């Protein structure tokens, strides 16, 4: 059990770090510039494995393409929200994907969470509700439409996570990562071409935060796909463990972006952490 738990924990903590890097990257470049180039750089890191990727079961490619489209929309929503919402609040709002993923895991995959998993979900939901009681944040007020975008992103990421569990039954983690990134790159390319989006290529390439983001993304996703491929792993539990990212985002919101209200956010994060611990018992 502990292998997939540790892999998922690595993903969660790295994801928290990625939110910091994303926000720093968005201070220099636009949302679509960051998305396209960080996806491109990430894909180039995987090109060496193309020989293995082409042996994927052809019938799985449409489902991988669908997963990529889901993430394509999720990332646009998530990046737009992150650019305008204080990091500490965004990180805890993103925890809502756990509730969505648990529901999808039960309905689609047929998982049956035990008493500890149900209790853990309830505790994490409490932490999210507590955050909602805090109306304002020193780093700026979160406008309703950006909160909606954050929730849409969380739901679509939960859909993607459920698809991962289905796909990794007969697609290796390296194959899934290669094709998923390739399709994602195609979607962003079409978005730029059809929308005639202007890109400051020179400035974006020099944005070193994007390079760091790409490396973190590739490492974290590979760990997550490996965890999903382990037969004993459960989406309902993995999703709760992923929320360890909220600890990183709350602390970074204060240390890096000087956001206020740290004590209350840490309390919310502590409640979330307690829920994670209970869920893996």
Q: What function would you assign to each model-found segment?
A:
Residues 40-41, 46, 103-106, 116-135, ...:
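Hydrophobic transmembrane alpha-helices of multi-pass small-molecule transport proteins
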Residues 31, 87, 113, 173-174, ...:
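Membrane-helix interface/capping residues of multi-pass secondary transporters
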Residues 40-45, 93-107, 183-187, 220, ...:
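Alpha-helical transmembrane segments of compact multi-pass small-molecule transporters, enriched
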């Amino acid at each position: 059990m502990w292998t997939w738990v540790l892999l998922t924990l690595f993903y969660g903590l790295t994801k928290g770090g990625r939110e910091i890097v994303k926000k720093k990257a968005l201070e220099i470049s636009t949302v679509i510039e960051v998305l396209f180039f960080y996806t491109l750089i990430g894909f180039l890191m995987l090109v060496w494995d193309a020989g293995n990727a082409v042996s994927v079961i052809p019938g799985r490619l449409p489902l991988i393409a669908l997963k990529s489209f889901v993430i394509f929309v999720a990332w646009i929503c998530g990046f737009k929200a992150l650019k305008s919402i204080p990091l500490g609040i965004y990180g805890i709002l993103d925890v809502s994907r756990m509730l969505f993923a648990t529901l999808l895991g039960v309905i689609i995959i047929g998982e049956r969470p035990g008493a500890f998993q149900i209790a853990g979900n309830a505790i994490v939901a409490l932490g999210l509700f507590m955050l909602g009681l805090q109306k304002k944040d020193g780093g700026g007020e979160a406008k309703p439409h950006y909160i909606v975008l954050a929730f849409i992103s969380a739901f679509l990421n939960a859909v993607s996570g459920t698809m991962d569990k289905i796909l990794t039954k007969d697609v290796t983690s390296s194959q899934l990562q290669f094709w998923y990134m390739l399709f994602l790159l195609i979607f962003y390319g079409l978005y730029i071409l059809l929308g005639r989006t202007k890109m400051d290529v020179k400035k974006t390439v020099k944005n070193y935060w994007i390079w760091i983001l790409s490396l973190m993304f590739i490492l974290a996703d590979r760990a997550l796909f490996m965890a999903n491929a382990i037969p004993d792993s459960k989406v309902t539990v993995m999703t709760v463990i992923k929320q360890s990212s909220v600890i990183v985002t709350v602390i970074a919101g204060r240390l890096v972006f000087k956001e206020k209200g740290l004590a209350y956010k840490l309390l919310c994060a502590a409640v979330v952490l307690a829920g994670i611990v209970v869920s893996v018992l």
